[in-house]
A protein has these predicted regions:
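Short loop/turn motifs that cap or connect beta-strands within the blades
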Residues: 90-93
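Acidic/hydrophobic-patterned starts of short beta strands in beta-sheet-rich repeat architectures
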Residues: 37, 49-62, 104-114
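Acidic, small-residue rich beta-repeat scaffolds with periodic aromatic anchors
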Residues: 23-27, 105-171
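Repeated scaffold domains used in trafficking and secretory/extracellular systems
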Residues: 96-102
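Beta-propeller blade repeat segments, especially FG-GAP/WD-type strand-to-loop junctions
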Residues: 69-88, 126-129
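Short N-terminal segments immediately surrounding and downstream of signal-peptide cleavage
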Residues: 20-43
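Short glycine/acidic-enriched loop and turn motifs that connect beta-strands
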Residues: 63-68, 116-119
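Classical Sec-dependent N-terminal signal peptides that target proteins to the secretory pathway
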Residues: 1-21
Length: 171
């Protein structure tokens, strides 16, 4: 009964977010992993962790049965805000040869993407936290072969609605 109530509540209110009832699925092993157990799971590699004002960002990679990098989906990112996890299943879809990194500066989370032949393009996304949510605020083209730096402002897009594969290299 409790699970049914939480399921209905998630469709009405939280849309992609539930603290303890959302699972990550390792695409190589098809293993369901509770978000509470991600950091201790043997098929998950913690690549990076960033902390700002009681909010934590975890950048992870999946491992296959042999402990090697999973190439079906290389990366995922989730946040821990007030003991609840915020996770978007579509966040890193179809980012094949992109190498992201998560950091924090002045209470702003930054995701850097390197991609292209010789990783010659770098894009940076700025995320802020407010009222228990994560918002995408702007994007900077840090370096590109065209040599044209560019800044794109977003209107506080909730991270639950972002799919970075649709934002990469759009300028």
């Amino acid at each position: 009964m409790r699970n049914l109530f939480l399921l209905i509540l998630s469709f009405l209110v939280f849309s992609n977010v539930l603290a303890k009832d959302v699972d990550l699925i390792n695409p190589c092993t098809n293993e369901n992993i509770l978000l509470d157990e991600v950091l201790s799971n043997k098929s998950i590699l913690l690549n990076n962790r960033a902390i700002s004002n009681q909010v934590e960002a975890f950048f992870i990679s999946y491992l296959d049965q042999d402990g090697e990098a999973c190439y079906k989906k290389k990366y995922d990112l989730f946040f821990k805000v007030n003991d609840s996890y915020i996770y978007n299943k579509e966040l890193f879809n179809d980012l094949n040869n992109v190498y992201p990194e998560v950091s924090v500066s002045d209470n702003v989370f930054m995701i850097d993407f390197e991609y292209g032949n010789g990783q010659s393009n770098i894009e940076r996304y700025y995320l802020t936290t407010s009222s228990g949510n994560i918002y995408l605020d702007k994007k900077d083209i840090i370096y590109s072969r065209s040599g044209k730096p560019n800044e794109i402002k977003f209107n506080n897009i909730n991270i639950k609605d972002v799919e970075f594969s649709k934002l990469i290299n759009i300028y």
